[in-house]
């Protein structure tokens, strides 16, 4: 990441999928980073031995400092993607994708337009 270290602590995987946490806890960072880690962990071309993958957020501006705490924490425990990593994350992803493609759910933009400040698709919603 090249922006400011905005990482916040979360208590559960469910918080990642709660839209109200995107701005306050930057759960989008968790979503993206854990998703990448799961893809690396599950890809036999990248991880033949199925070694655990530890997703981190590395902030360039903090690279020299001793205080570069890059670990993603859920309930104060570092996230490690392996055989024992909970299926709750996969279920959350599945639910999001299912909702996107559910034709019975009409599209409605978020009521919290602060989330849209830098979105390149803003003009399609408002």
Can you describe what each PLM-predicted range is?
Residues 1-126:
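RecB-family 4Fe-4S metal-dependent nuclease core
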């Amino acid at each position: 990441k090249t922006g400011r270290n905005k990482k916040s602590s979360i208590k559960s995987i469910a918080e990642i999928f709660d839209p109200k946490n995107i701005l306050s806890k930057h759960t989008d960072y968790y979503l993206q980073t854990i998703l990448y880690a799961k893809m690396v962990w599950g890809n036999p071309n990248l991880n033949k031995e199925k070694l655990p993958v530890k997703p981190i957020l590395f902030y360039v501006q903090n690279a020299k400092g001793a205080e570069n705490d890059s670990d993603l924490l859920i309930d104060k425990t570092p996230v490690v993607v392996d055989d024992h990593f909970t299926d709750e994350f996969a279920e959350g992803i599945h639910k999001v994708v299912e909702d996107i493609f559910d034709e019975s759910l009409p599209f409605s933009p978020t009521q919290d337009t602060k989330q849209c400040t830098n979105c390149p698709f803003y003009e399609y919603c408002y």
